[in-house]
Amino acid sequence: LKDQGKLEEAIEAYNKALSIKSNYAEAIYNTIDLLKTYSPESVESPNLFNIDDKIKKLSPKILHATSDSEIIDNLAVGLNYLNEESFEYKTPLSQIYKHNSVDLNCKRHAKIFNTKDIIPKFCFGCFKVQVEVPTFIDLVKLTSLFYKFDFEEDLTRKSIIELRPNISGYYKGLIYCYGLDQAKAVKVILDISLNKVFDEKPISFIKRGCSEYPLKFPSYGEIPKNPKKIMTFPKEWKPLEKKFDQEELIEPKDNITASLPEFCLSDFYIIQKWIDYAKGIGDQSIETFIDRPIIFPDIYKKAKMRSMH
């Protein structure tokens, strides 16, 4: 139902499933995922919907906070809402997306790269504006900025904790752009906003495609001043990409609903994961949350290992 764009019917179906079995993991995940894009008008509901509604009502206080302490206080309120759940839900996600209604089909592209040792043609037009920030609180501020940031086009953006062992850095934000010219224009607008939000403006830069690609093909990651010198899709890769699609076609999804521009239940489960990561790397900005139990020990351990290198 969700994939057909029938969101209200999907909510009713998940609602029914959860009323029968409140700890039904798949229904919980699907419900939380759907609530990122849709708020039901009314649900005579399991706790899940009520908590999402409370967090969405709390969201403006975080989005428009004027100090770090205000952000921290409101995060604490939202995290306490999660404790109202009677079941243990652990999100598999670690990135907060504000996605548009276009599926970039990144799963396909990553699989082609990993199985065929080539970069798919689509990815040669993919450019991102990346921002790196020093602390957990700054990552929340960046996420708020991404929710409020208004482009002529609704570009997908995300905030992440870096977990990939061969990629440097900790806290990052990325905006997906269609081509280098758009990325340059977005960076100019973003830099103005970053100056307003942060006392010390974080560094932003344009990168091409996924970070793994230039590790294998360094020329792909180079963005020369003369655009004619940029690496283009090698013709000899075309049959390999075609063969992949013949063997294992991964179609982009239709009927994608854009994310709501606000914090929601899904985000707060991810924020809990970010806090555990921050504890692992010794980030002082989470001092207020230091007594909260670690919910994601695997993330805490990965972060701790990361901080040792």
Task: Report each predicted region and the residues it spans.
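Position-specific recognition of the canonical hydrophobic site in helix A of tetratricopeptide repeat
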Residues: 1-2, 36
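Charge-rich, low-complexity segments
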Residues: 25-143, 158-160, 223-227, 233-309
